[in-house]
Amino acid sequence: EWKAGSALTENKNNGEQLRINLITDVGFTKPINLSIDAVPIPLLGNDYNRKTEINTYYENVRQVFNSMGIEKSGKANSFVFKSISEALNTLAVSHSDKKQLIVTSDLRENSPLYSFHNQEMLSILKKSPDSVKNIFLTKYPLMDLSGIVVFLYYEPVDYSDSDVFEIIADFYVSILTSHNATN
């Protein structure tokens, strides 16, 4: 569950900012920002009010995640790497103590740059992942991702879907770890 990585699980007086970007056919969306402020002086805080604030924050996050599953893709394109790289580079320059990116996607890029829906291009990825890596990183460079933890979540529909996801996820993990992110 996403709450396990929350700064609030470590200390209820912490603050937290959560930014959610959807991967779409146009390559960018307006981010959804949710936050809860840190308690400035914990000794003067009200435990009951803080618990209510935290529960409200968690409920707002849960509602956003639940609403994301409602819209079905079925779109012609998906700019997966662009969206992920922009989110990672934003985190790389952030001064937050804890940086996490949660990606819920099949990771199947389908853009003018590359398509994991194309069997020939998927074969190239299997045989020569470094050449595909160079294509993506030339177009969308990544900064040093030290201190960023990335979670890749997807629920495959069948064995074939799972197999393809594993290939693409391994590709992403290779890119992420080469830029010092952890997963």
Regions inferred by a protein language model and the residue ranges of each:
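Von Willebrand factor
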Residues: 1-96, 99-103
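Well-ordered, non-membrane alpha-helical segments in soluble/globular domains
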Residues: 1-6, 78-85, 122-136, 164-174
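Hydrophobic beta-strand segments of well-ordered beta-sheets in folded domains
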Residues: 14-20, 99-102, 141-156, 182-183
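DG-centered beta-turn motif at the end of beta-strands
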Residues: 87, 98-110
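VWA/integrin I-like adhesion module and closely mimicked acidic/polar interface patches used
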Residues: 108-165
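Von Willebrand factor A/integrin I-like adhesion domains
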Residues: 156-183
